[in-house]
Amino acid sequence: MTSRYRSSEAHQGLASFSPRRRTVVKAAAATAVLAGPLAAALPARATTGTPAFLHGVASGDPLPDGVLLWTRVTPTADATPGSGLGPDTEVGWTVATDKAFTNVVAKGSTTATAASDHTVKADIRGLAPATDHWFRFSAGGTDSPAGRARTAPAADAAVAGLRFGVVSCANWEAGYFAAYRHLAARGDLDAWLHLGDYIYEYGAGEYGTRGTSVRSHAPAHEILTLADYRVRHGRYKTDPDLQALHAAAPVVAIWDDHEIANDTWSGGAENHTEGVEGAWAARQAAAKQAYFEWMPVRPAIAGTTYRRLRFGKLADLSLLDLRSFRAQQVSLGDGDVDDPDRTLTGRAQLDWLKAGLKSSDTTWRLVGNSVMIAPFAIGSLSAELLKPLAKLLGLPQEGLAVNTDQWDGYTDDRRELLAHLRSNAIRNTVFLTGDIHMAWANDVPVNAGTYPLSASAATEFVVTSVTSDNLDDLVKVPEGTVSALASPVIRAANRHVHWVDTDRHGYGVLDITAERAQMDYYVLSDRTQAGATASWSRSYRTRSGTQRVERTYDPE
């Protein structure tokens, strides 16, 4: 089924694991076929004096009248990412309403320099809303591959439907990015959401697949400096499937922790040793600088990814930064998860989110959310027993959280947000989440201990990883083995969880109409194979006004 806003032209076409492993997953237990007009071959390597576009093109953060365009030019052979080499280079950009570029609607130029790693960003305005646009760059007589970007509907437009690809957690060494290839081939996406862990910071062989690496990182060591982060971003953007998806539709991206270091918090990270690995402030600044250089992201506030986009009267999308302002994570079973002085969002961001959700006049309020907000607890007791016992023993008030890196570790922020939704009768809030390397469909209860007899304030769709290890990979058993055992146990202890798949890799497609928001979950045949196939797994939806998830059998 094609998007209701897709033009006919566009339609063509658990054991002890290393401390450097993701907290969630351990606690809970390229040959490619490119699509249609986006099948441009990778350009040849730059030769001296001949600019080349080796890292593809991208667009992001669509507005009704504009979109942010991105590329990197390689002006000379020695001007590799992170090298600091290469001359200033004039780069032109052209935007048209047809892929033959006969109807040009915008053009201009800028200068790419070594100071920005020869990356180029052009924030184009004055475009028509809800319209496919084609764009390309040029330098020294060389044209880049063409990309397609769709502008958002006008703010007051009555929109019949929207469709977004949804992905997270793509570890280069763990496999190939076939999920991106399959999303690119659809040709019906208004945009795609990357919910974090676009890159990983580990050194070669530290975080692969079942103890091996399918392909090697660059640089080979753990990334610490600005040059390191630039090299790693550059390696990722040589992937043909990632290039194809970036050329197919605008990305709306937020970071999680691995864009910087595992389990990042405001003053450090689990995967950072102060002094030995330099100063945290310098490392964080380097990682963020490289991210904004290499990603088509338009920050509303410098140094953070929280911002808001609108898609007509149908939906708005609040995008969160859950790393820059958070308190340090506490250990499993620590009652400090309930400490009101500890924050995940930071005061300013939480107030911004609450105000935006309250003032929204759209049918759906989407929240791009890097870590799971629905409670995920073990050892559940009845509410009348849990609260006094937790108070007596200094345990978490909402049960023993499996992962204190997510909202479970910052329950005061969550309680405040959910109470705000309930007290203001804010309906149709849908959290879109990554991070945990599993697929989930959740209600978001106000009180998990009394659910489902008590209210649900929102719903949540969690997508699995593109390639990063999930439970079956960590315990090295056949895919599906762990999920068959773990899923019933998880659901029994967490009655707001409608479904969880702990084992498979893939992606989601979110389809929205005025009546419902539906996530279709797709899984890959084998992440270690560049030509991996994709198949539909399940679909869940939330109907308008219900604040609850239900299964459906009709993928869009």
Curated annotation (Swiss-Prot):
Changing E259A: Little effect on metal content, visible absorption spectrum and on activity. Keywords: Allosteric enzyme, Hydrolase, Lipid degradation, Lipid metabolism, Secreted, Signal. It is found in: Secreted. Changing H217A: Strong decrease in activity. PROSITE patterns: TAT (PS51318). Binds 1 iron ion. Iron is essential for catalysis. Binds metal ions, iron, manganese or zinc. The ion could be involved in the binding of substrate and/or the release of the product. Its main location: secreted. In late stationary phase, is proteolytically cleaved to a more active form where the two parts of the molecule (phospholipase D catalytic chain and phospholipase D regulatory chain) are still tightly associated. Predicted to be exported by the Tat system. The position of the signal peptide cleavage has been experimentally proven. Residues 1-46 form the signal peptide. GO terms for biological process: lipid catabolic process. Activated by calcium. Allosterically activated by phosphatidic acid in the presence of calcium. Proteolytically cleaved PLD is more active than the full-length enzyme, but is no longer activated by phosphatidic acid. Changing H233A: Loss of activity. Altered secondary structure. Changing D197A: Almost complete loss of activity and strongly reduced content of iron, but little change in secondary structure. It catalyses: a 1,2-diacyl-sn-glycero-3-phosphocholine + H2O = a 1,2-diacyl-sn-glycero-3-phosphate + choline + H(+). It comes from the Bacteria. Its cofactor is Fe cation; Fe(2+); Mn(2+); Zn(2+). Full-length phospholipase D is a monomer in solution. Proteolytically cleaved PLD is a heterodimer composed of one phospholipase D catalytic chain and one phospholipase D regulatory chain. PANTHER family: ALKALINE PHOSPHATASE FAMILY PROTEIN (AFU_ORTHOLOGUE AFUA_5G03860) (PTHR43606:SF2), PHOSPHATASE, PUTATIVE (AFU_ORTHOLOGUE AFUA_6G08710)-RELATED (PTHR43606). This is Phospholipase D.
